[in-house]
């Protein structure tokens, strides 16, 4: 859902950035100074406090940001925003991205245009609600791991370069047996990330759908499937596998799953509230990031 919102201004702004990304400390420092000049209260997430001089500012652990802030601004690339989403979504804290990465599908504002933030803080912006996935790895009756993903839940080969055999069920109905290098279960947000390189479709962010994208399937007729996002997906790892594959959520964590285990994926109960400038246009972003500009229609 994308809507233009006019509401009371954001006054308490938390800043977050990823260490080791070029230009992030400089942009964080400039952003801090700009926000102070706008008479906003600035809160630093603990890692951000290590990158800039925040001696006069409140420093807060990532999991406590909602108690002190009403907006989280992330400086970095899409990977930085993914990391921030894992922190902000359970707290239901809105997120705005400043792009210091390469693609920037999720981080809208260039570092040399920080003045765009002023209108957003005054309550003039577009708010986009994007859903996440929740993945659960089970072996027998034991829950081995559980996590959320803004982009994707991915079944990956184990340490040996071998195909994985697995069964796919949707809402407890058997779909197919597959032998492939893995499977990507992607949200619309993730459809322009790893799943795109695997031949998956681009899903508009407002679609309440997810796609199942096989990775290098043994059968040429295996193709991506788009399903209702309210579905529950179950992947059962065949007991015949002689290696243990991995399950990853947004590339953040990787968990081994034994043959015979199950991976359950469903829609997470909290969404991401992503903030954009009022002139944000999804198709403009696609044209720029996927190099469609040369074929842009003349209006």
UniProtKB/Swiss-Prot annotation:
It is found in: Cytoplasm. The active site is at residue 78. It holds the Pfam family NAD_kinase_C. Its cofactor is a divalent metal cation. NAD(+) binds at residues 78-79, 151-152, 162, 179, 181, 192-197, 252. Coiled coil: none annotated. It catalyses: NAD(+) + ATP = ADP + NADP(+) + H(+). Its main location: cytoplasm. GO terms for molecular function: ATP binding; metal ion binding; NAD binding; NAD+ kinase activity. One of its GO terms (biological process) is NAD metabolic process. Its EC number is 2.7.1.23. SUPFAM superfamilies: NAD kinase/diacylglycerol kinase-like. Keywords: ATP-binding, Cytoplasm, Kinase, NAD, NADP, Nucleotide-binding, Transferase. InterPro entries: ATP-NAD_kinase_N (IPR017438), ATP-NAD_kinase_PpnK-typ_C (IPR017437), NAD/diacylglycerol_kinase_sf (IPR016064), NADK (IPR002504). The keyword Transcription regulation does not apply. GO terms for cellular component: cytoplasm. Involved in the regulation of the intracellular balance of NAD and NADP, and is a key enzyme in the biosynthesis of NADP. Catalyzes specifically the phosphorylation on 2'-hydroxyl of the adenosine moiety of NAD to yield NADP. Belongs to the NAD kinase family. This is NAD kinase.
């Amino acid at each position: 859902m994308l809507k233009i919102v006019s509401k009371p201004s954001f006054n308490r702004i938390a800043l977050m950035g990823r260490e080791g990304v070029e230009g992030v400390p400089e942009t964080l420092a400039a952003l801090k100074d700009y926000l102070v000049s706008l008479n906003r209260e600035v809160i630093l997430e603990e890692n951000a406090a290590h990158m800039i001089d925040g001696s006069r500012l409140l420093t807060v652990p990532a999991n406590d940001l909602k108690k002190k802030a009403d907006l989280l601004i992330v400086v970095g690339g899409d990977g930085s925003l993914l990391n921030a989403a894992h922190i902000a979504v359970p707290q239901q804290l809105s997120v705005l991205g400043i792009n210091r990465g390469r693609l920037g599908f999720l981080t809208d504002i260039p570092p040399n245009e920080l003045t765009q933030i002023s209108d957003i803080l005054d309550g003039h912006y577009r708010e986009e609600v994007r859903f996440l996935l929740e993945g659960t790895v089970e072996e027998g009756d034991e829950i081995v791991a559980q996590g959320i993903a803004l982009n994707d839940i991915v079944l990956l080969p184990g340490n040996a370069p071998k195909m994985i055999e697995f069964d796919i069920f949707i809402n407890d109905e058997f779909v197919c047996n597959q032998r492939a290098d893995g499977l990507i279960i992607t949200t619309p947000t993730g459809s322009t990330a790893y799943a795109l390189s695997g031949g998956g479709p681009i899903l508009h962010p407002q679609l309440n759908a997810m796609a199942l994208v096989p990775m290098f399937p043994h059968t040429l007729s295996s193709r991506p499937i788009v399903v209702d996002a309210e579905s529950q997906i179950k992947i059962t790892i065949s007991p015949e596998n002689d290696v243990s594959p991995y399950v990853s959520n947004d590339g953040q964590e990787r968990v081994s799953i034994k043959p015979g285990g199950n991976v359950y994926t469903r829609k997470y109960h909290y969404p991401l509230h992503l903030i954009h400038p009022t002139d944000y246009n999804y198709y403009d972003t696609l044209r720029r990031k996927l190099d469609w500009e040369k074929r842009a229609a003349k209006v």
